[in-house]
Amino acid sequence: MFRISSYVREISSPTPLGPKRNPPGPVVIWNLIRRCNLTCKHCYSISADKDFAGELGTDEVFRVMDELKAFRVPVLILSGGEPLLRPDIFEIAGRAKKMGFYVGLSSNGTLIDASNIDAIAAADFDYVGVSLDGIRETHDKFRRLDGAFDRSLAGLRLCAALGVKVGVRFTMTQDNAGDL
């Protein structure tokens, strides 16, 4: 026999699965810059390899970070555009780390090279995420740049070689699902 009363009791006063916790604030994925060295066909941002008016300066970014900390935001993912095109990216990351944020860098990976890998490692990002959209041909087609896959992969390998926690991000579409 099915007794609804026991189910109603459980719904009205459920058995806790663990101790009650106050969740931390939200994860903030912050598009610090619109400029990008790529023109990916699937990107939501209308980007180009040029500066755009109206972007926040370093001091303004720092003020926003103060506000985010006051709102108990625990995680900042620095994104764009391509955040490595921002001259103050390492200053921003350094301040965020000093403030106690978990700091991630979201990059297309093509600009991670010998000229900046030491600065990336020194910035002590908690995570560097590099987007790949498939294997070589598919990725380069999405990115509209021949050689983008090889450059991104080289950036991933440089990070790994210096002990930077790095990972691949893959957005599956009908055009690249077979590459997964």
Question: Language model features by range: what are they?
Answer:
Residues E60-V64, I92, N116, A148-L158, ...:
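A general structural detector for well-ordered alpha-helical segments in enzyme core domains, enriched
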